[in-house]
Amino acid sequence: MHILVTGAAGFIGSHTVLELLNSGYTVLCIDNFANAISVTDEHGNAISLKRVAQLTGKDVPFQNVDVCDEAALEKVFSENKFDGIIHLAALKAVGESVAKPLQYYSNNLVASLNLIQMCLKYNVKNFVFSSSATVYGPPSELPITEKSQTGQGITNPYGQTKYMMEQILIDVGKANPEWNVVLLRYFNPVGAHKSGLIGEDPKGVPNNLMPYVSQVAIGKLPVLTIYGDQFDTVDGTGVRDYIHVVDLAKGHVKAFDRIKTVGNIGTEIYNLGTGVGYSVRQMVDALKKVSGRDIPVKIGVPRPGDVASVYCDPSLAQEKLGWRAETGLEEMCADLWNWQTKNPQGFSA
């Protein structure tokens, strides 16, 4: 199967492309570096994907395309025959989405609608969408299952765009019963490929916990602010479901494996997480252990909308996709630290 991967140069994208190639799929990668660092070679190829080519020994074709640019996207579809789409491209910083809601609604929805329209026009019927645990809002129950309430109390435009896109894809799937739509609700991806050649290289100050912690550990940032230590959790700090990015990437491969094996599956929704929650302090302590570095912390006030605990029940993905997260906390942190120490300046080094 030939797969178009949008947002392919980023953290999740590069790891997903690697797992697709290792599983016998072929890919075309597109990205416009809205989130990923725009580090390219003299030919305009993404450094992250060049490293994927190095790791797999396979060709990784790449085009610098903004999915919001309908004409550029149409050119991609008119020149290639795709069997399926993995749609990862989106603006993704929760805090920024609150400050710039229109930018998020415009970018994330227009990009996705353009892509769906091209799929309809060029008869591409298999669509795997990068969704998020944010669609659940503050959890009404723990662990969160795929049947848990969605769309209520979502505290930021980023999460709203993911929820809206889910609804649009569910409706498109109903109207086009020959389509296969898989909505993958990610929890908190961390870690990096074992080689240390690819990993998370955020623009500016990291928005996510673990890249921030690792940059404090290596000395790029002075101190970690923990937002709240009075939650009803094991140590007062927020608990989340952290999943190794390689395990997450394999979930996308399993989605296409299921489509290949079963045929017409309609629309299916899966949580991709470990089912185990770790607190901020537990994550910091684990990285301290693997790095041997001190990680200074200070306590700040909780951010608006922060909840005590979020973790999922991943058993549906285990049952139907034959997928489970295999990597434990210490290994996640060791792989992150390996990436950070080998690439202290990210892909810019």
UniProtKB/Swiss-Prot annotation:
Family listed: Belongs to the NAD(P)-dependent epimerase/dehydratase family.
Pfam families: Epimerase
InterPro entries, per database record: Epimerase_deHydtase, NAD(P)-bd_dom_sf, UDP_G4E
Spans traversing the lipid bilayer: none
GO biological-process terms attached to the record: cuticle development; defense response to Gram-positive bacterium; embryo development ending in birth or egg hatching; galactose catabolic process via UDP-galactose, Leloir pathway; galactose metabolic process; gonad morphogenesis; IRE1-mediated unfolded protein response; negative regulation of endoplasmic reticulum unfolded protein response
GO cellular component, one term: cytosol
Cofactor(s) of this protein: NAD(+)
Binding site for NAD(+): 10-12, 31-35, 66-67, 92, 162, 186
Chain positions recorded as substrate binding sites: 132-134, 186-188, 207-209, 225-227, 240, 303-306
Organism: Caenorhabditis elegans
Name this polypeptide is given: UDP-glucose 4-epimerase
Free-text tissue specificity from the UniProt record: Expressed in gonads, vulva, intestine, hypdermis and nervous system.
Task performed by this protein: Catalyzes two distinct but analogous reactions: the reversible epimerization of UDP-glucose to UDP-galactose and the reversible epimerization of UDP-N-acetylglucosamine to UDP-N-acetylgalactosamine. The reaction with UDP-Gal plays a critical role in the Leloir pathway of galactose catabolism in which galactose is converted to the glycolytic intermediate glucose 6-phosphate. It contributes to the catabolism of dietary galactose and enables the endogenous biosynthesis of both UDP-Gal and UDP-GalNAc when exogenous sources are limited.
Molecular functions per Gene Ontology: UDP-glucose 4-epimerase activity; UDP-N-acetylglucosamine 4-epimerase activity
Source organism, top-level taxon: Eukaryota
Key words of the record: Carbohydrate metabolism, Galactose metabolism, Isomerase, NAD
Gene: gale-1
Organism taxonomic ancestry: Eukaryota, Metazoa, Ecdysozoa, Nematoda, Chromadorea
The protein's annotated pathway: Carbohydrate metabolism; galactose metabolism
